[in-house]
Structure formats: C-alpha cells, structure tokens
C-alpha cells in the first residue's frame, strides 16, 4: 500500500513537549530525569490519515511504550473523560492534561 505523507507542525510538537517537560501524559514517565536525556513523542488522538487535525487539542505527548501499545491495540480515546480505553476493557486516564484544560486558542 502507498504511504501518504501528512504535514506535521514540528514547532507545535516541540511546544507541547516543552509544556509537559517531555513527560508522558499517560503515565508521567520522564526520561530526562532518569537518563538525563529528554525523550518523548507526540501522538495524534484522531489520526491525520482519518481526517484528524494537526492542532494541540488532537495531540498528546507520550512515551514510546504508550505510543506503541495505543497503535498496536487501536485503543480508543474518550475525550470527555480524558482516558484511553483498550480492547480488553482496561482504562488509563491521562495523568497530565494541562493543554486540554487551557482556554487558549493556539494550535
């Protein structure tokens, strides 16, 4: 299958990582503290490939482990409860959600 490219705003991604100091919004893991190296990824809640927007309200900062398991299991995000629901019924609430609660219109 052909791989389609989607525009991603790297400044937005880096800004969100800075807000959370590179901590995973799901588990709070901070590689910078443990390994002296900032290491986090950003994940689109609604995938760009399915019409999701590259805006702050559609992006979370996440550790590589959570990024992989969310994709592998196709976990669903509950926007009202700010949690991921996995196919086996397990639910994991975001421990960090500052940018969802801001009344800002950036991104």
Regions found by a protein language model. Give the residues of each.
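A detector for short metal-coordination/catalytic motifs
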Residues: 7, 32, 37-107
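Short, well-ordered alpha-helical segments in soluble proteins
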Residues: 20-23, 31
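Short, flexible, mixed-charge glycine/proline-rich loop motifs
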Residues: 12-20, 52-56
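Conserved hydrophobic/aromatic pocket- or pore-lining residues that grip, position, or stack substrates
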Residues: 16, 24, 67
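Short cysteine-rich clusters marking metal-coordination/redox-active sites
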Residues: 24-27, 63
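A short mid-domain helix/strand-loop element embedded in enzyme catalytic domains
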Residues: 1-9, 13, 33-34
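A generic local structural motif
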Residues: 10-12, 27, 49-50
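Append "and, occasionally, other polyanion-binding protein interfaces
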Residues: 11, 22-25, 40-43
